[in-house]
Amino acid sequence: MVARKFVVRHEDSSFDVDYNTEDGLEVLRFLIFSLTLVPPEEQKIVAEDDNRLVSDESDLASLSERLRLVSVGEDSVENSDAEMLKSDEELARMLQAEEDAIMFQQFVAARDNGEFEGRIRPYVSQVLMYEDPVRQDAARKTVPKDELEEKALVSLAKEGNFEPSKEERDYAFLLQLLFWFKKSFRWVNEPPCDFCGNKTIGQGMGNPLTSELAYGANRVEIYRCTMCPTTTRFPRYNDPLKLVETKKGRCGEWANCFTLYCRTFGYDSRLIMDFTDHVWTECYSHSLKRWIHLDPCEGVYDKPMLYEKGWNKKLNYVIAISKDGVCDVTKRYTKKWHEVLSRRTLTTESSLQDGLRTLTRERRRSLMFESLSKLELRDRNEQEELERNLHSADNASVSLPGRQSGDREWRIMRSEFGSDENSSVSSSSCPVRKCVDDHVTNIYDSFLPILTQFVEDGLPVARTNEVLKMIKQVLVDLKNAPYKTRKARLTLDSDNSSSFPEQFLPALGDLLLALSLKSERDTNGKSVTISVDGKLTKTAIALPVALDALRELVADLSKYQNLNKDSLSFPLVKQNRVCSGSVLASGEELPSGIATAAFDGIQESKWEEPNGAKGCWIVYKTLYNQMHQLIAYELMSANDAPERDPKDWILEGSNDGGSTWCVLDKQTSQVFEERFQRKSYKITTPGFQANLFRFRFLSVRDVNSTSRLQLGSIDLYRSHQ
């Protein structure tokens, strides 16, 4: 062990770092992060004496004590000073632009006349409705809480986290609440006719009725049916109690109602008002220790650059409003502060901050000292975060879409449309993701003893399918039951065709084990109760896989005249599936179309490569770098868009870390005729052992109609070891 003291220079500051060399470079990076707030993955550390880049191979004991921290985005160490100078010049221009904008504000400030506060104060009253127990109770009753809790746990399990903390569970539940709300609430362009349901045409505004005013509908839009003489009213309700009932509206109604749901489930939440005509929600994440952007209209979370970068919005004021106060959060949503500042002409910056502080003090007047101190600390931390965010580099690898909610022509008119192809968040710089899919392999393996028992007993194919459908029905009953108390009954009778043959019960052992289920014979001996064995999340993540696999197995067996031992081979029987490795792709769609979705065994999920139509790749690395000889693989088409199916591809293997690749299989002009169609391929390359496998997809079915590639599943099968 060598104790070192480094002096790290970053921008205009120097930091002393005490460090033990045996701790490794990773610890040094985190020490530097604690001082500079530059994340470890964004650090380039340079020894100033010889201008060498510090890497894992560097001798930290003999390294120069003077280090320089530079941007990870620089092309080389040699041009770092030039890049810094360029950044300094750009910063100077931005600061000058800010000064000019502030100077301009002085001339327009006289026009304020309380306009800014007048726009904010009504929302301060509105957010207090979210604290009403009656409104919260009404909202709570409409949410399938157990279902969302289960989905939250499964989402964490897919990342390998089977024992999450409360903060992690809360954050995962919040995201599931967002996705549920996106599907439950309805966007209204023109409401359908109240009488016949046909299209309507706007006729202007009408006078609100007393019943509409009772729920804050001061504005009522009037529409005329194109097919009948009926007039349809569209009250713009502001009371979330009514919105919980109607479940429809535009961005104002969506954000208003969703923020109530967030408060109902205990999240620190605030309504975000964008003065360029949009509204959304923020919630505080205790696991991430920061406020999270949530847009219920778009179903997008933690993507604050969505509006400036994706929608091309020219932001000016973005104000957060909650029961605890009012805050200017514009800097979270822009990387062009000097441009935004030039558009902030309602009042001066100092007057704006004074006004927000006044509103905040009003809301916090009755708080106890401890609560007030916590809020003030969080406020300070947020302001520091906003300043860091303003000057941090934008992630160029993430592509943000134009607006998706609302009529196409309306979005185009507002210049928020984007493009037809770019309709979701995607990334061209994917992380290495771990495949949590050992349960998929175990489920596939568990069908062999079941089928073997059927063959040994001479069961006809028709009867085999009947028995498999009984197993499937039990799994359906379990999946539909509350996830904490899953239980189903299997009736036993060797002679009754409508009951499960008792002699086949032992053959189910491996399947139940793969699903984290247990069986217990009832006291009458005529049925078996199947229930969870305590590993609730493992059962939840595995049940959909087993159901999809059983559906496929029943469909495959229907093609057989007879079932014998020779039938129990690939592709009917899928043994020795490779699992638990890691995967890296050329691109992916966030959050649902990530690379590991191709290995999760679930038909409805898929890997999407937004720019993969004319070429993309996905690499699989085995667990612990184990060498495998691949003997077969399968690909499955996704749920929709046949034009995105892969048509030509090459499968390669490597045993030297990817320096060289051996072609294992090559396919051209492949066509998936159906959705969820599985195609099986045997590998003829003899005896090649590899721990890296790469698919290079060369083209999709119709490269002229899409830029995307999508794939429902990839399964790799190794030789028996």
From Swiss-Prot:
GO molecular function, one term: peptide-N4-(N-acetyl-beta-glucosaminyl)asparagine amidase activity
One GO BP annotation of this record: response to ozone
Cofactor needs: Zn(2+)
Family: Belongs to the transglutaminase-like superfamily. PNGase family.
GO cellular component, one term: cytosol
Function recorded in the entry: Specifically deglycosylates the denatured form of N-linked glycoproteins in the cytoplasm and assists their proteasome-mediated degradation. Cleaves the beta-aspartyl-glucosamine (GlcNAc) of the glycan and the amide side chain of Asn, converting Asn to Asp. Prefers proteins containing high-mannose over those bearing complex type oligosaccharides. Can recognize misfolded proteins in the endoplasmic reticulum that are exported to the cytosol to be destroyed and deglycosylate them, while it has no activity toward native proteins.
Main subcellular location: cytoplasm
Domain of life: Eukaryota
Catalytic activity reported: Hydrolysis of an N(4)-(acetyl-beta-D-glucosaminyl)asparagine residue in which the glucosamine residue may be further glycosylated, to yield a (substituted) N-acetyl-beta-D-glucosaminylamine and a peptide containing an aspartate residue
Extent of the signal sequence: none
Active site annotation, chain numbering: 251, 278, 295
Pfam family, one: Transglut_core
Coiled-coil ranges per UniProt: none
EC number, as in UniProt: 3.5.1.52
InterPro entries associated with the record: Galactose-bd-like_sf, Papain-like_cys_pep_sf, Transglutaminase-like
This protein's UniProt keywords: Cytoplasm, Hydrolase, Metal-binding, Zinc
Name the UniProt record assigns to this protein: Peptide-N(4)-(N-acetyl-beta-glucosaminyl)asparagine amidase
Binding residues for Zn(2+): 193, 196, 225, 228
Record text on cofactor binding: Binds 1 zinc ion per subunit.
Subcellular location: Cytoplasm
